[in-house]
């Protein structure tokens, strides 16, 4: 068992919900209520030293066809934290390791504790997740939109956000296709349908 998982199981035995590994990267899903404490532990534990917060991002698992989350998820949204333990040759701290910590967020209660007290660099990514997905970060000192206009209605990265569009006239006088007219290739197909 990898040291990150072993140390977390020891310190937070009731809070680890799911563990997976993909291409050498460990992904651990934890209880959202404990996220700040868990990240603080990962940052400050001498054996781990996850001292670099790379990013956090939102994921919407909604299947628009069924209205339910895909992949057997119990929740519609996730917030994923990407952490690194960078080695410092002068102090000997850090391990050159990457770790993904995830929290599930239900649609009817889209709130996660802020981690800005642990990693100051989470301030703007948390605001972006709020703006795009509508997930609020409890305790964040400036929880307002960062990309969309303040009076924007809705959250555009949600899979149930209505696709809009406006007619755009090109310099040669033609108009581009409407959203309804566009045919989007399936990611597994070539442009020639093969």
Question: For the regions a protein language model found, what residue spans apply to each?
Answer:
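Terminal low-complexity/charged segments
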Residues: 1-194
